[in-house]
Amino acid sequence: MEWSEVEVHTTNEAVEPVANVLTEFGAAGVSIEDVADFLREREDKFGEIYALKREDYPEDGVIIKAYFLKTTEFVEQIPEIEQTLKNLTTFDIPLGKFQFVVNDVDDEEWATAWKKYYHPVQITDRITIVPSWESYTPSANEIIIELDPGMAFGTGTHPTTQLCIRALSDYLQPGDELIDVGTGSGVLSIASAKLGAKSILATDLDEIATRAAEENIRLNKTENIITVKQNNLLQDINKSDVDIVVANILAEVILLFPEDVYKALKPGGIFIASGIIEDKAKVVEEALKNAGLIIEKIEQQGDWVAIISKRGVE
């Protein structure tokens, strides 16, 4: 088989939207080369598995590489893929010095290239995300989430995902019922299940994402707790007693359904919203307040924000 590599040079803020677009066009795997991963100070908890080399990373920004079977259909789609990525600026997503390059690669190169940049990542004192092909020995009481990022939508390493997982660690109680809106890879649902949630509904509008989530959920043996549904946000989800709703999606999308979140939550229920770039945080905060939600806490990592709000006790 012949493969093509699509290489996109962009900003850290654009990583997840760009990766999602590439996956929606049929990418079989996505790798992310972010210089911030190298420059960020980390305690080397993972030995050689976690070793990073400066030469593996760009001078600035982020390089995203996606791998496609080189078919006639893909070749014809190349201009559309590039234009769709450029159109992300209409959502106020900064692309930086955007560069879009397509190269041919052989089978062996494709099979290993994207795995080079994905390593175990400790999200909290208790939770570590581990690529499915790595051997990793957890410490006592450590929660391991196995992911195969070749399938779709997020590896758990992006700041917005980390913000959500930390908030779940703080607010989720054993036995809680939860809805994960825009589940992507399923990582937040899996984390919630392993933190003790009793029942989880994971929704995503994209069929590729729901299939990826189902596979990752099976990989983590949490399918008895998590139900995956292809669905548009909370549309036609007739629930009014949910303990937590979590959504790691763009601010513009969060603005579409705060009233539905309010209706889905039981009194005292928590809404964890992330995927919010810093300059959109105030707009989202006001929309949540206007829907009747009470702001509990605002957390920030880099340019990204998570807003935790709750429905008042009536």
UniProtKB/Swiss-Prot annotation:
Catalyzed reactions per annotation: L-lysyl-[protein] + 3 S-adenosyl-L-methionine = N(6),N(6),N(6)-trimethyl-L-lysyl-[protein] + 3 S-adenosyl-L-homocysteine + 3 H(+)
Keywords attached to this entry: Cytoplasm, Methyltransferase, S-adenosyl-L-methionine, Transferase
Entries under InterPro entries matching the protein: Ribosomal_L11_MeTrfase_PrmA, Ribosomal_PrmA_MeTrfase, SAM-dependent_MTases_sf
Membrane-spanning ranges: none
Record-listed S-adenosyl-L-methionine binding positions: 161, 182, 204, 248
An example Gene Ontology CC term for this record: cytoplasm
Enzyme nomenclature, EC number: 2.1.1.-
BP terms from Gene Ontology: methylation
Paired cysteines (S-S): none
Pfam families named among the record's database cross-references: PrmA
GO MF term (any one): protein-lysine N-methyltransferase activity
Major localisation: cytoplasm
NCBIfam families, per the entry: prmA
PANTHER family (UniProt xref): ELECTRON TRANSFER FLAVOPROTEIN BETA SUBUNIT LYSINE METHYLTRANSFERASE
Similarity comment text for this entry: Belongs to the methyltransferase superfamily. PrmA family.
Function recorded in the entry: Methylates ribosomal protein L11.
Record's protein name: Ribosomal protein L11 methyltransferase
Organism this protein belongs to: Listeria innocua serovar 6a (strain ATCC BAA-680 / CLIP 11262)
Lineage: Bacteria, Bacillati, Bacillota, Bacilli, Bacillales
